[in-house]
């Protein structure tokens, strides 16, 4: 993982997103529980688009910005929730006979082949910006429905609390700082990617959340689950707080 971080970091340096000094500082002071790219976004050192471009070069996969809320419901219905949540991927369009799946990290060829076999459809993978797939999975596929952040923002504009331009800035900031629970668990060092992928296959057949499934099966402790959930809550901005701050003439930074 350290080698992968260094490689991604070097790509970001080469692309001019950060300096060598900033990379060294990030590797030294990176917050526990965040991967290097995610930490750089969280710290305001790079944008989600700069990270997507670096990951695109690293994985040789096309990067693009998506609006998960604009995906047709018919397309969502054609892609099972079990696959979406397992592979952390969203169907965004079809290109001829191929289904295009957006993810925030590259989906490996073996997994792409497995999805293609299940759906009996050729698959193409593209990289979305950090947070875009996360908010899309929560909106379209999550069992647990909280306040819809986009609706909160639209309501604030309709009420005259925010201008459309302010809302766009807030949405960009909010989305780029959303983190998948599995990413935090991996970054905390509690579970490696290969083990997590195997466990996700088992979880497909249950109604439990990933955290609950891992605790029930003694993969992680309740304390570890709590630590990961608290970190996720701490690093993810609240939409209502962002709206209050901006409408009160505060600056999002």
Regions found by a protein language model. Name each.
Residues 1-253:
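Non-catalytic accessory regions
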């Amino acid at each position: 993982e350290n080698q992968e971080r260094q490689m991604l970091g070097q790509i970001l340096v080469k692309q001019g997103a950060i300096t060598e000094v900033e990379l060294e500082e990030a590797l030294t002071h990176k917050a526990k529980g965040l991967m290097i790219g995610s930490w750089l976004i969280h710290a305001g050192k790079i944008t989600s688009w700069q990270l997507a471009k670096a990951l695109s070069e690293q994985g040789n996969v096309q990067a693009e910005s998506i609006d998960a809320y604009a995906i047709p419901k018919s397309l969502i219905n054609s892609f099972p929730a079990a696959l979406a949540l397992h592979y952390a991927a969203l169907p965004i369009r079809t290109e001829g006979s191929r289904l295009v799946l957006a993810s925030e990290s590259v989906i490996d060829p073996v997994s792409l082949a497995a999805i293609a076999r299940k759906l009996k459809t050729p698959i193409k993978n593209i990289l979305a910006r950090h947070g875009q797939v996360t908010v899309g999975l929560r909106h379209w596929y999550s069992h647990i429905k909280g306040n819809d952040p986009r609706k909160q923002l639209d309501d604030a504009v309709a009420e005259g609390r925010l201008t459309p331009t302010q809302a766009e800035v807030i949405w960009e900031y909010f989305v780029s700082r959303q983190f998948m629970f599995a990413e935090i668990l991996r970054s905390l060092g509690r579970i490696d990617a290969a083990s997590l992928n195997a466990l996700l296959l088992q979880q497909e057949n249950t109604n439990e959340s990933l955290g609950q499934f891992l605790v029930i099966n003694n993969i992680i402790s309740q304390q570890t689950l709590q630590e990961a959930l608290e970190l996720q809550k701490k690093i993810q901005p609240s939409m209502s707080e962002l709206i209050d701050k901006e409408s009160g003439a505060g600056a999002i930074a």
